[in-house]
Regions:
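Extracytoplasmic electron-transfer domains, predominantly the class I c-type cytochrome c fold
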Residues: 88-89, 110-115, 122-186, 198
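Juxtamembrane/interface segments at transmembrane-helix termini
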Residues: 33-44
């Protein structure tokens, strides 16, 4: 009559641990697949790469109480309409270049990185580029030769010359334009775009 209750037995807890771990792993796999479907290019919150062919803005939505990306009419990057594959390759070059040049050692992207230099999440839309007509040319010149085309945005901090080629600069700009189209739940907050009316 000295029988151990089921809940107090070692085998019960071993089996419970195995089932709980297996269940948690299964839930993790399902959530991962769900997240990937929602954060892949071409989804509702992350537009397809060919969005670089469109005008992109960032406007406050009173109903949602946050700023949202607004995709408008055609506004071709560097005067060219890119196919989805060409756009993907150009954005991919820009992403790989920002990784290779360690841009996040000074900048943030989507809130990740360092806060020494400006956040790049909506850099394509930044008022510091003066006008939409001048933006592409100014960005290319700045990325290739930041010392002679300095954009300090009032901080007096200057970007070092990272020996970025013209093609890499165009890739970075495509990447930044694509990034500005991503729905970031209103981040960065209180951001005023180059298109904003005073």
């Amino acid at each position: 009559m000295n029988e151990t209750p089921l809940w107090a037995s070692e085998s019960f807890w071993k089996k419970t641990a195995i089932w709980v771990t297996a269940g948690a792993f299964l839930i993790l796999v399902v959530l991962t697949m769900d997240s990937l479907s929602k954060t892949s290019a071409g989804s509702k919150r992350v537009p397809a790469y060919s969005v670089i062919n469109k005008k992109i803005d960032y406007q406050y939505n009173k109903e949602l109480h946050k700023s949202m990306p607004v995709i408008g009419e055609n506004e071709f990057l560097f005067g060219k309409e890119y196919t989805e594959e060409e756009a993907r390759q150009l954005v991919d070059l820009g992403k790989k270049t920002t990784q290779a040049k360690n841009c996040m050692n000074c900048h943030t992207l989507l809130g990740n990185g360092a806060y020494y230099a400006p956040d790049l999440t909506k850099a394509w839309l930044d008022k510091g580029w003066i006008s939409r007509e001048m933006r592409e040319d100014m960005m290319v010149k700045f990325l290739i030769d930041p010392e002679n085309n300095a954009r300090t945005f009032g901080s007096n901090r200057k970007m070092p010359n990272l020996k970025i080629t013209e093609q890499e600069a165009k890739g970075i700009i495509a990447f930044l334009k694509w990034m500005s189209s991503i729905d970031t739940n209103g981040f960065p907050y209180n951001f005023k775009t180059i298109n904003a009316e005073e």
